[in-house]
Amino acid sequence: MKKRLISLLMVLTLMVSLVGCAEESTSNEGKSVKQDVTVAWDIEPPMLDPTLTTSTAARDINKYIYEGVVEMDANFEPQPQLAEKIEHNDDNTEWTFYLRKGVKFHDGTEMKAEDVAASLNRWSGINGSAKLIIKNGEKFEVKDDYTVTIKLDTPCLLFLYYLANPSQFAGITKKSIVEAADSSSGYKSIIGTGAMKFVEWKQNEYIKLEKFADYSAPSAKLSGFAGDKTVNFNTLTFYMVNDASTRVAGALADQYDFVNKISYDSMNQFDGVTNCSLTQGQYMIGGLIFEKKEGCGSYSEDPNFRRAVSYALDINEIAKAQVPNSDYVTIDSDYMGPFQTAWDTNAGDAYYNKHDLAKAKEYLAQSKYDGGTVKMVTNTEYPDMYNGTLVVQKQLEAIGIKVEVEVMDWATQLTRIN
């Protein structure tokens, strides 16, 4: 009998995410700015529906297209974006969103409360976190053209944090687009209120965006994802370049202005290149995802099996496979990351990276594991995930778990996870 364990790998890493190499032209503000910007992008997103997909490749492109009623600032605090003002009662069950007037969608129509309510009601039925707080069919209601309300059955102090979460983002689009959306493939039209509008998607080649001349920015300066997102260039084209060495070569040859996900052993190629700059950003490399829904028939339903896996893992060795240069990785129990100061905690230290084969075998013997095959799912588009999975396979086999690794493309893996 085959059981299944869907798997990604987690370490907290400091990742070199972007290289910028650009020739410049002069803008009307007197600053040197290139007007047609090109990016070599590592992964083609499965869709450009901000609410339906969990893909970071989609999220980072969608942030130019869509906005939310609130967005996260640089300190990971939610701030009004399409909302002008937000009010709530003392127990955080009744929320009122007063919308900014005159905000236009990319088709030229004005955003109204019916669009916001439709978008947020769809979000609340899809987003996993939203389902934890909107459990009993509560709905966002239209009070007037510029006011949306919701009454929660359960108090939620963190409601705005859920709304501002960039994963499965509560991006606002037209009511008609929400109503026509497909439950699997998402929105049929890509229209938001963001600083750039969608122009063209040529599969396996590029996604092109264009500056939205009628963009209505909030008064606050840009901080994180919140505030004025006005761009000072005309077009932004994301070219799908899966191979990391090809992205590097393209940057060095001035084929692309920006390149993401530079491999650690390629960074020295930019030493002395005066028109290029490296930007480093912290991000999390996935996490182990167990299929453990009650009744699914997976070994992962058993807490002792999961404990056995935890003690079998040597995170240090996994990290070496994922990030060869130790200068760019931090191993930490903190799920959110120390850079998110509001959420930083060491609560998991007692259980994290406690590699102990004897304890692992002890828990495995107490579990329901009967010698069957555990399946791990991974992909090669993200080398850190693939390389880490192979190390985990060896570590689990070392305590007597039979492991089969299934490799698929990232879009298919996301579908399996969802």
For each of these PLM feature ranges, what is it?
Residues 5, 196, 326-366, 380-385:
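Structural transition elements
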